A protein has these predicted regions:
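OB-fold nucleic-acid-binding modules
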Residues: 1-35, 39-65, 69-221
């Protein structure tokens, strides 16, 4: 994965070599946590594959092991993270791959293994951990977000939620957690007791944040 990252030296770079990566899908749209993309982590790091489609999880299940053929695709940089997709046709660094074309690049290897997350403290999270699948333990919601829900309600449409940043701390440092307004638990109350959060280190709105993956793995401690 590090070699692939090194190729993304420009805003968008065409991959001309035969490069394959094998890893686990550690984030997708199963719970609405990441739309129109999947994150593949090979144990050394991750990359976000942009996809044009809905219900991606039905084709590429969360935590499945996959092989991605990178030749012919483009790498791009979105802040501190590396993304991959089709050659860009507009202002984006890469375009999304159509669902109909996805399996020309992506092969399912195994659907029966769950990847191990890397256990980190908040202080260990930086750009070098971008798109890694991680677990952070003994986290506490900040005082001024107690009794809130994971996402704020959209004032223009009270039936929908907005993508929201929440904050957790470990007594020493504070972690930003980005929660997609489309996630299945957007309207649920935030945990009031210490907990563990599992997810990917992501880049959101110009900063590093944790994006929860597979919400049912949040553990009260």
């Amino acid at each position: 994965m590090a070699y692939l990252w090194s190729l993304a030296a420009e805003r968008s770079t065409k991959i001309k070599r035969d490069i394959y990566i094998v890893g686990h899908v550690v984030a997708n749209d199963k719970f609405g946590e990441l739309g129109k993309a999947i994150v593949i982590d090979d144990g050394s790091g991750g990359i976000e594959l942009k996809i044009e489609g809905e219900d991606i999880n039905s084709v590429v299940p969360l935590f499945s092991r996959v092989m991605l053929r990178c030749s012919g695709l483009n790498l791009g940089r979105e802040g501190a993270k590396t993304v991959i997709g089709r050659a860009p046709t507009a202002e984006y660094v890469v375009d999304r791959i159509d669902m109909d074309d996805l399996l020309n690049y992506l092969t399912l290897v195994d659907c029966n293994t769950v990847p191990e997350s890397e256990r980190l403290t908040i202080s260990a999270i930086d750009s070098h951990k971008m798109l890694h699948y991680v677990t952070l333990s003994n986290l506490q919601l900040v005082d001024n977000e107690q009794e809130m829900t994971w996402c704020d309600v959209d004032p223009q449409n009270r039936q929908e939620h907005l993508t929201t940043i929440r904050h957790f701390h470990d007594l020493c440092d504070t972690l930003c957690v980005v929660v997609d307004g489309a996630c299945h638990y957007a309207g649920e109350k935030l945990p009031t007791h210490p907990c563990s959060l599992h997810g990917i280190v992501d880049w959101h709105d110009g900063d590093i944040a944790l994006r929860i993956s597979a919400y049912q793995l949040v553990e009260q401690q």
